[in-house]
Amino acid sequence: MNSLFASTARGLEELLKTELESLGARECQVVQGGVHFEGDTRLIYQSLMWSRLASRIMLPLGACKVYSDLDLYLGVQATDWTEIFAPGATFAVHFSGLNDEIRNSQYGALKVKDAIVDSFTRKNLERPNVDRENPDLRINVWLNKETAHISLDLCGEGLHQRGYRDRAGIAPIKENLAAAIVMRSGWQPGTPLLDPMCGSGTLLIEAAMMATDRAPGLHRGQWGFNGWAQHDDAIWKEVKAEAQVRARKGLADYGSRFYGSDSDARVIERAASNARRAGIGELISFEVKDVAQLTNPLPKGPYGTVISNPPYGERLDSEPALIALHSLLGRSMKDYFGGWNLSLFSGSPELLSCLQLRAERQFKAKNGPLDCVQKNYHLTEKEGDSKPSTVAEDYANRLRKNLKKFEKWAKQEGIECYRLYDADLPEYNVAVDRYADWIVVQEYAAPKTIDAQKARQRLLDIIAATIGVLGIAPNKLVLKTRERQKGTNQYQKMSDKGDFIEVGEYNARLWVNLTDYLDTGLFLDHRIARRMLGQMSKGKDFLNLFAYTGSASVHAGLGGARSTTTMDMSRTYLEWAERNLRLNGLTGRQHRLLQADVLGWLRDTDEQFDLIFIDPPTFSNSKRMEDTFDVQRDHIRLMSDLKRLLRKGGTIMFSNNKRGFRMDNDGLAALGLKAQEISQKTLSQDFARNRQIHNCWLITAV
């Protein structure tokens, strides 16, 4: 009787124990990451051939205390390696674990190798050769604290490598994990099984192999016992022959079918090729189909199971796309699969909640380093005929109402960028902006008192509802998180995609970038102010300070300004402004772009202008500015500098975003200036719900 150890993925240990017992294993003991068991030589081969869940099966050879590298060397030599190595067998050492004495796994492997080789040379026997790539024997040493556990790896390559998969699709799951998912799904062999996002087909192939009694080890060409001195080839051939007979009979007797689909034609080709290599290709129908096209292949029955490992962040980099995918899958299940079961394996329980289905059972497991969950659902027959439930229904209804109102208005105004929703409902605390055929959802950061998990779930619901109501492609939705900005944080770069899209605003064409920065390059709430500047600028010299991307300069130029001067401290935004001007045909020396500290430039310049637009930050302590700036504290000093630049009869349009800003009218009067507040006049319909979003004034000489 041999003492053995079978390793497996975390979370599958009990399932593996049951499987090993069904094969005849004795004295099974579950530990984290595997099962200790006992069995004779036939059971060794049976477990290697038939275990669908084990990652590796090890034959423990001994253990030793390791307080020095010499202890490791002598402990390895305590094993009689001549009883392990067949003549001429090559080997490799896999060493894992460290302690205070063995601090490098390569060094540990080297000491083990030396000990094994020296045990042969000391007996005047031919020393075995090392073959790291394709060894006959794999010696496994695991150092746990002060104890080294020495084993013979009987598998060679991991048991998940069944031999049927050539090239996997994106982010595949291992075959033994796939087998566990099938076992836990509730699916019964003889009933239909469908995977609508099958990738390389692993779930379906593993299920078909189970259903047809095909051993998972039948297609493997190499094993870790080939160079084992105690290998019994006769027993192994018996085990293999029995597996071949059972596979042929199982395939001939099986009458049900499997269905797989995926949106990628190349992946489907690989899946079909994998199934053929596994010997069950004739049982699986593969087709290229998106989840949006998913229907029941057996609408008149019988009932079956839908199983899948949908993408959950490791396979797609767009969260809105994942949310839309899961929402769509949930609706398809309700629409077409009443009476069926559904089982999904995912690394994101939040995404599974987008299905809007209640799970009956769930299991936990690891997919590599990822904590994952498998949830099983039953779709009642009435659900298959019912209208899918609406995600975030109150929010969806409000967004639908706003869309009807603003879409028509925006078309009449000649604008392609506008706000559709601005935290209208307190529990759905986001802003939703349209930029042509793109949507930007800005999440206002939740207070620390709000549970982070609940806030994330609410956001997922919002994104799903937004995509559903607006009918946009998921890749046309951009998600941002907005917090209170300090200084120039709103200008910090968030991405390097560099994707610009062209949008229309009245008679202007402008470039916006929806992904690389917190803001997009166009402040939508200043839309009317920009139009006013265009109407006021004919024949005038126009100065645009803290100009950002120069959209106000574009409107002034299109309005017939004699010249435009666009100033900002950022070279990036000035280059953006230059692109905006050029897009509208505003080129030439009369359209200047200046990179400068605005406040310092104002104090030093003696230039004169007829129309000045200034939209300073609420507060700034930029290293590139000479001192700090606070718009409430410093606006009169700012007006004093601006007055020097203002020609007789000229106008300053002064705007800021400080809530509760108070204009110092007495201070203005002392400068010989007066102010007319136009804050409400510059708010368009889409911002009427937020009357404090900006302050705006026209300032002229008395």
Curated annotation (Swiss-Prot):
One of its GO terms (molecular function) is rRNA (guanine-N7-)-methyltransferase activity. Disulfide bonds: none annotated. The keyword Transcription regulation does not apply. InterPro entries: 23SrRNA_methyltr_KL (IPR017244), DNA_methylase_N6_adenine_CS (IPR002052), RlmKL-like_Mtase (IPR000241), RlmKL-like_Mtase_CS (IPR053943), RlmL_1st (IPR054170), SAM-dep_methyl-trfase (IPR019614), SAM-dependent_MTases_sf (IPR029063), THUMP_dom (IPR004114). The keyword Nucleotide-binding does not apply. It is an enzyme of class 2 (transferase). Keywords: Cytoplasm, Methyltransferase, RNA-binding, rRNA processing, S-adenosyl-L-methionine, Transferase. Residues 43-154 form the THUMP domain. Pfam families: Methyltrans_SAM, RlmL_1st, THUMP, UPF0020. It catalyses: guanosine(2445) in 23S rRNA + S-adenosyl-L-methionine = N(2)-methylguanosine(2445) in 23S rRNA + S-adenosyl-L-homocysteine + H(+); guanosine(2069) in 23S rRNA + S-adenosyl-L-methionine = N(2)-methylguanosine(2069) in 23S rRNA + S-adenosyl-L-homocysteine + H(+). Its EC number is 2.1.1.173, 2.1.1.264. Coiled coil: none annotated. One of its GO terms (cellular component) is cytoplasm. It is found in: Cytoplasm. Gene3D superfamilies: 3.30.2130.30, RNA methyltransferase domain (HRMD) like, Vaccinia Virus protein VP39. Specifically methylates the guanine in position 2445 (m2G2445) and the guanine in position 2069 (m7G2069) of 23S rRNA. HAMAP family: 23SrRNA_methyltr_KL (MF_01858). Belongs to the methyltransferase superfamily. RlmKL family. PANTHER family: RIBOSOMAL RNA LARGE SUBUNIT METHYLTRANSFERASE K/L, RIBOSOMAL RNA LARGE SUBUNIT METHYLTRANSFERASE K_L. This is Ribosomal RNA large subunit methyltransferase K/L. The lineage of its organism: Bacteria, Pseudomonadati, Pseudomonadota, Gammaproteobacteria, Enterobacterales.
